[in-house]
Amino acid sequence: MQKLQIFVYIYLFVLIVAGPVDLNENSEQKEYVEKEGLCNACLWRQNNKSSRLEAIKIQILSKLRLETAPNISKDAIRQLLPKAPPLRELIDQYDVQRDDSSDGSLEDDDYHATTETVITMPTESDLLAEVEEKPKCCFFKFSSKIQYNKVVKAQLWIYLRPVKTPTTVFVQILRLIKPMKDGTRYTGIRSLKLDMNPGTGIWQSIDVKTVLQNWLKQPESNLGIEIKALDENGHNLAVTFPEPGEEGLNPFLEVKVTDTPKRSRRDFGLDCDEHSTESRCCRYPLTVDFEAFGWDWIIAPKRYKANYCSGECEFVFLQKYPHTHLVHQANPRGSAGPCCTPTKMSPINMLYFNGKEQIIYGKIPGMVVDRCGCS
């Protein structure tokens, strides 16, 4: 009994010397750990975001088959950018980004961009065709995007200078050919008559699909065209070689090629915001700003929602591949852990200058993360 009393006295002495026990110590440590964990998650997401931005730059150049970003200044763009209706409509009504992730489909697309519309500006011919000893507009070179795709539409756009009085204008599009025995150097493509009212000039489009298809089959026959738009006094109103103040009024070709859609399959995933405390694999918002990159050669969109994936992929979270969970349970050391990656990607439409100062309107696959999952 005396030994027990001594033990109790010693125990009480230790408590007094050690001081009172802080009952909140464990909760504070737990709170610190939780905050530290959240900070680590934020840092991990920031690293994923930075990596995604750098990957997007590389992907865009690669998918557009560009070794480097075209070096085109803003001043040059103002000079080269046509002021024509089809291009203005593309810019004004541009569908910057669809975020229809609710459809839950996984797109199987090709790696490289699928071109929908190519706007080609006139250039100088390697074999300069001349009529009456004067070079005539216009000669067009065609990229592989046009050469190796099915052309569904080809329009020649020309700008007619304004008139002071109501005038009837006779428009002729002539195709240059090799000299014939009788000296003929051209053959007609299309003729039309227009009634113009005084005031502003107008843009006129002309169907040249048949001619373009012939040029693609026989490239040596492409010697260029001559454009005439004569008023009643014989003055040519067509802008072929723009004068000062007529920048952006050059003739150009608008060519549309086919785009074959592909089938898709179903998939689902989590959506989060930057303030989310979700630890599982999730899709987070990310806006790409091309102006911040200094990429003035991209006409539209100037920015788009790309999104990125981040989060943990524990085996218990796996729903897409349940067999993976069973494999891990059978051999936990021999099976690699899953990663948080995109499971649904969608394309963006882009209007841009290529390395040859041609304006391209195309679809770039796999640029938007619509779903994230563990795989």
UniProtKB/Swiss-Prot annotation:
Synthesized as large precursor molecule that undergoes proteolytic cleavage to generate an N-terminal propeptide and a disulfide linked C-terminal dimer, which is the biologically active molecule. The circulating form consists of a latent complex of the C-terminal dimer and other proteins, including its propeptide, which maintain the C-terminal dimer in a latent, inactive state. Ligand activation requires additional cleavage of the prodomain by a tolloid-like metalloproteinase. Gene3D superfamilies: 2.60.120.970, Cystine-knot cytokines (2.10.90.10). It is found in: Secreted. InterPro entries: Cystine-knot_cytokine, TGF-b_C, TGF-b_propeptide, TGF-beta-rel, TGFb_CS. GO terms for biological process: myoblast migration involved in skeletal muscle regeneration; positive regulation of lamellipodium assembly; positive regulation of macrophage chemotaxis. One of its GO terms (molecular function) is growth factor activity. Keywords: Cleavage on pair of basic residues, Cytokine, Disulfide bond, Glycoprotein, Growth factor, Heparin-binding, Secreted, Signal. It holds the Pfam family TGF_beta. Transmembrane segments: none annotated. This is Growth/differentiation factor 8. It comes from Aepyceros melampus (Impala).
